[in-house]
């Protein structure tokens, strides 16, 4: 392949395959970060899809770290593309076919409901960003609104969205709470 996008993507795929082969019997899940693949364009996305499919073939749960969130129609397309099935003529196909995806709640219910709907239909799940572990997360997530940090309010919305789609005693909707903030995690 040489020094090409295809070459980089193939190297990533082979690396991932090696890691999965060495660990699949020791771990329950993987969480590939799609941006690391997207930077290599279409070849990178092909490597992402191959990685997802290979992990699923090894019975691993795949959490697509995609952090999507947009207006309703765009979120619906993201939800179908990552967790659902897209209609092509008379047939339906799974796009990336992850088991779970990470979602950004910043656009509100418009951006979350399409994911919740697909989760209910496909019996898959989402993890919504509530209190993340990145160093600058507090710039917005810790802002007080009526004396309460924003992350608490987001956590309440996650619980509300999650109560609408229960499956097998668990909700299809979960929260991302960074382990670097144990005090906030305990509150949530």
Language model segments and positions:
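Acidic (Asp/Glu)-rich catalytic clusters
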Residues: 20-27, 52-57, 116-122
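Catalytic PLP-binding core of fold-type I/II PLP enzymes
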Residues: 49-70
């Amino acid at each position: 392949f040489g020094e090409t996008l295809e070459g980089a993507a193939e190297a990533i795929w082979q690396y991932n395959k090696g890691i999965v082969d060495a660990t699949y019997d020791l771990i329950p899940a993987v969480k590939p970060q799609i941006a690391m693949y997207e930077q290599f364009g279409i070849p990178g996305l092909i490597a992402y899809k191959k990685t997802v499919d290979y992990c699923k073939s090894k019975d691993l749960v795949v959490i697509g770290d995609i952090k999507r969130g947009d207006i309703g129609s765009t979120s619906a397309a993201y939800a179908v593309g990552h967790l659902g099935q897209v209609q092509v003529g008379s047939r339906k196909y799974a796009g990336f076919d992850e088991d779970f995806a990470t979602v950004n709640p910043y656009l509100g219910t418009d951006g979350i409901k399409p994911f919740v709907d697909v989760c209910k239909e496909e019996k898959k799940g989402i993890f919504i960003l509530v209190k993340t572990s990145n160093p600058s997360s507090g710039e917005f997530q810790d802002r007080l609104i009526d004396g309460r940090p924003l992350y608490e309010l987001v956590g309440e919305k996650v619980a509300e969205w999650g109560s609408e789609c229960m499956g097998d005693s668990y909700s299809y909707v979960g929260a991302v709470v960074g382990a670097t903030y144990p005090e906030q995690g305990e509150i949530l």
